[in-house]
A protein has these predicted regions:
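Acidic/histidine-rich alpha-helical segments that form the ligand environment
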Residues: 44, 106-141, 147-164
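Short, contiguous alpha-helical
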Residues: 42-53, 63-102, 141-191
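Bacterial N-terminal signal peptides
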Residues: 7-19
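N-terminal beta-strand motif that seeds the catalytic metal site of vicinal oxygen chelate
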Residues: 33-44
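Carbohydrate-interacting regions of secretory-pathway proteins
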Residues: 28, 46-50, 106-110, 115, ...
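Cleaved targeting-peptide boundary
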Residues: 20-33
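Well-ordered alpha-helical scaffold segments within catalytic/enzyme domains
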Residues: 51, 55-56, 90, 120-128
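Positively charged n-region of N-terminal signal peptides that target proteins for export
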Residues: 1-6
Length: 191
């Protein structure tokens, strides 16, 4: 048995020893991606945009005025709120005055809300596209607190996902499978 183990060990180590004797350096480690923090944040944002827009498209227009109980937003108002919030968060990062389009208060139709949501995401795309790990450390005021720009974009992602969770409830109550549970949509399959 020991002879077999020695033979296996020699077979495994001999080529490595020969390579080292010839002066071949070990393989170089892959270079880390540039701006890994901002790139990851942008990837999350891309997924969040996709599920929000898909939710807006899946819900029939007659359900845009639906709300599960009194005291909460309608499905359409949630979409309008998310669109307004894109401007609020990303204008801070871009150093611009918030356009404050008041979408939640002024848009009610499915077509208008989807268009407004797409416009709001296009506005935010500029903030995510221009972000680097270095520029992400610059401080902006967000809800009265000093916040790194990258943190503000992370809060935007979290806020949007929070409201996606609301939309999931609305869709389930109308027997609509939400995007992240739809095997035809979700890259992970059925959740």
């Amino acid at each position: 048995m020991r002879t077999i183990l020695r033979a296996l060990l020699i077979c495994v180590l001999a080529p490595a020893a020969a390579a080292m004797a010839q002066g071949n350096p070990p393989p170089a480690a892959a270079a880390p991606p540039s701006n890994p923090l901002s790139a990851h944040n942008k990837t999350i944002y891309g997924g969040v945009k996709m599920i929000l827009l898909r939710s807006a498209e899946k819900m029939p227009e007659e359900n845009y005025s639906f709300k599960p109980t009194d005291g909460v937003r309608t499905f359409g108002q949630v979409l309008g709120h998310v669109a307004d919030s894109q401007y609020a968060f990303c204008s801070r990062v871009l150093g611009e005055k918030n356009p404050a389009p008041k979408i939640e208060e002024t848009k009610t139709s499915k077509g208008d809300l989807i268009a407004a949501l797409k416009d709001a995401f296009a506005y935010c795309d500029k903030a995510y596209d221009g972000m680097t790990d270095t520029s992400g450390t610059q401080i902006v005021k967000l809800m009265g607190a000093d916040t790194p720009k990258l943190g503000a974009l992370s809060v935007n992602n979290v806020h949007t996902v929070e409201h996606y969770g609301n939309l999931v409830t609305y869709m389930r109550m109308k027997n609509i499978v939400p995007p992240t549970s739809d095997p035809e949509f979700s890259p992970r399959g059925k959740n």
